[in-house]
């Protein structure tokens, strides 16, 4: 995989972004870009280390509802915290709201996302490549290495990961420069992977809940009813009667 920073630079300029000079709002080791004015206003900050990983900060707002269809490179793994957003992932359908943490898995189906207008998109994300976790990590911990792919996959979308939220906020608020900044970002990347693996370990230890065939059938009936009556006022009591389930 080629240098990540060069790839982002080329892609962003090709989409109409303009590179800006460094400001005291962000660390000077990254590169800063402005969103094309015809789409909205705001900035996009990127820091990368060779072909190993990158860290990105988004802070912009669109003039119109905007639909995005993009793929993540094969093998890349990412995690993102949305401080502010209003939108939906189309397939699979998931609502994106402020305060959620989401993982990204490269090489799967391209992500289809609708971002609503006039709501700031403020997010911080970390992305690692196979060069990082299959070579760098594996060489560093040859006897303890665990492929992080499953751990990233199991996060999906959650608002119950306060440790990761705190870490990504620290990244956003950091404004250092030089080697101190590079060491800071590298340490935070390592910490993030540690948190993801620990989160996965804790989730795996929770007791699993198995649904009976009757419960699955009831849920499918409820889903079908909602799809057929999406433009109607539906009450919780009404859905409880349809699915033969209680409020809890």
What would you call each of these model-derived segments?
Residues 163, 211-222:
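N-terminal positioning helix adjacent to the helix-turn-helix/winged-helix DNA-binding module
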Residues 90-211, 247:
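Alpha-helical bundle regulatory/interaction domains
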Residues 1-29, 35:
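Short Lys/Arg-enriched alpha/beta "domain-start" segment
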Residues 4, 45-47, 226:
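Short, functionally important structural connectors and interaction interfaces within domains
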Residues 28-145:
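N-terminal regulatory/effector-sensing and dimerization cores
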Residues 192-202, 221, 225-248:
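Basic/polar phosphate-binding segments, predominantly the helix-turn-helix DNA-binding elements
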């Amino acid at each position: 995989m080629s240098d990540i920073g060069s790839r982002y630079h080329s892609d962003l300029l090709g989409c109409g972004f303009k590179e800006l000079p460094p400001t005291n709002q962000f660390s000077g080791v990254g590169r800063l870009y402005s969103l094309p004015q015809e789409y909205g206003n705001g900035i996009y900050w990127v820091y990368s280390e060779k072909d190993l990983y990158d860290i990105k900060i988004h802070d912009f707002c669109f003039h119109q509802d905007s639909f995005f269809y993009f793929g993540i490179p094969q093998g890349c793994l990412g995690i993102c915290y949305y401080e502010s957003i209003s939108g939906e992932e189309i397939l699979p359908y998931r609502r994106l709201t402020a305060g959620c943490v989401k993982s990204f898995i490269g090489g799967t189906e391209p992500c289809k996302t609708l971002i609503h207008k006039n709501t700031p998109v403020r997010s911080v994300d970390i992305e690692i490549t196979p060069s990082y976790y299959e070579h760098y990590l594996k060489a560093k911990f040859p006897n303890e290495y665990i492929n992080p792919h499953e751990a990233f996959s199991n996060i999906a979308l959650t608002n119950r990961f306060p440790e990761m939220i705190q870490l990504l906020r620290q990244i956003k608020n950091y404004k250092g420069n030089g080697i101190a900044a590079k060491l800071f970002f590298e340490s935070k990347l390592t910490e993030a992977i540690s948190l993801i693996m620990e989160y996965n370990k804790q989730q795996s230890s929770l007791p699993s809940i198995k649904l009976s065939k009757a419960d699955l059938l009831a849920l499918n009936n409820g889903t079908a009813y909602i799809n057929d009556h999406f433009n109607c006022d539906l009450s919780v009591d009404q859905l409880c009667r349809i699915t033969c389930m209680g409020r809890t």
